[in-house]
UniProtKB/Swiss-Prot annotation:
A Gene Ontology molecular function term of the record: toxin activity
Keyword Cell wall biogenesis/degradation annotated: no
Main location group: secreted
The keyword DNA damage is annotated on this UniProt entry: no
Propiece residues: 19-49
PTM sites of type 4-hydroxyproline: P61
Described purpose of this protein according to its UniProt entry: Probable neurotoxin with unknown target. Possibly targets ion channels.
UniProt protein name: Conotoxin Cal1.5
Organism: Californiconus californicus (California cone)
Alphabetized UniProt keyword annotations: Disulfide bond, Hydroxylation, Ion channel impairing toxin, Neurotoxin, Secreted, Signal, Toxin
Signal peptide location: 1-18
Amino acid sequence: MRCLPVFIILLLLASTAAVDVAGSKLKRRLERKPYQGSQAYVKKTAFGLRLCCKRHHGCHPCGRT
C-alpha cells in the first residue's frame, strides 16, 4: 500500500514529460514552417496541446487554414 502514492506520482511525471516532448515537436514543426507570419504559438491546456494564433481573439485552434 505504501508504493501506491509513489506510483501515482511517477505516472504524473511521465505524463507531463510526454506532453513536454509533444510540445517541443510541435514547436520545431512551427519553426520549420512558419504559420501566418510566425503568429502561432503552442498553448498547454487540460486536454493537451493546442496550436493557437495571436491574430485571433483568444486561443483559436489554428490547425486548419
